[in-house]
Swiss-Prot record:
Record-annotated active site: 110
InterPro entries named in the record: ATPase_NBD, Type_III_PanK
Record protein name field: Type III pantothenate kinase
Reaction equation(s) it catalyzes: (R)-pantothenate + ATP = (R)-4'-phosphopantothenate + ADP + H(+)
Organism of origin: Ehrlichia chaffeensis (strain ATCC CRL-10679 / Arkansas)
Amino acid sequence: MLIAIDIGNTNIKLAICANNKIIKRITISSQSRRTADEYFIYLNSTMNQLNLDYKNINNIIISSVVPSITKPIIELSQNYFNIDPTILSNHHADIFNIKISLQNKVLGSDRLADIIAASSLYPHKDLLIIGMGTATVFNLLNKDKCIYGQAIAPGAHILAKSMRQYTALLPEVLISKQDKVIHDNIYHAMESGIYWGYITMINGMIEKIIKEEEKDLYIIATGGNSNLFFNHKTAIHNIEVDLTIKGLIQLHTVLS
């Protein structure tokens, strides 16, 4: 069995996988820093509930954009599973014939995992991949599997937290679907502003990117917020919530 781990700025997503299929998803806040022992207790408890033996784990693959969390996860892998985990990095792009045509070849490992999966799921398409996480990342991947452009904007949760952080009286609100724009109380007004403002940003960026590229793009979204905004007046064609994990599974398949 495989454990695929996506360490993000907001959440750590662990997927227990068998036969290249996800059988259990676990989400842990990245804000609550834990030791390797604490991660193991949490993971082993979940596996016991599924009648799974942690000793059957034979590979661990990690994507991380938070180096301080990577260290205890590596310790978890080595101390409890006797596994030196694979850490996804840009050099793995060559395995999948993915070309990175960006300045300094800099690409977050979560975005690389997304591209690995997307290029397999949607071959021979020009893609716009929107990662809706802590930040909102727009990645352009052409049909020749070359990532050649990107734009980065705040994520929806950053918008919500910033209003609370930088004002004296506004409350912190949850992000939820809104049927209307204008409301008569401050909570719903803020929720609406964040929700519809984010959708307007997404649609505006898509429109400008398509105009600038002058070609049809197949648009997919992934990340923690993608379910919330899909099919509600957005130009997104499809969502792939587990795109990052699927990319890690593909790397496992190739390396096995």
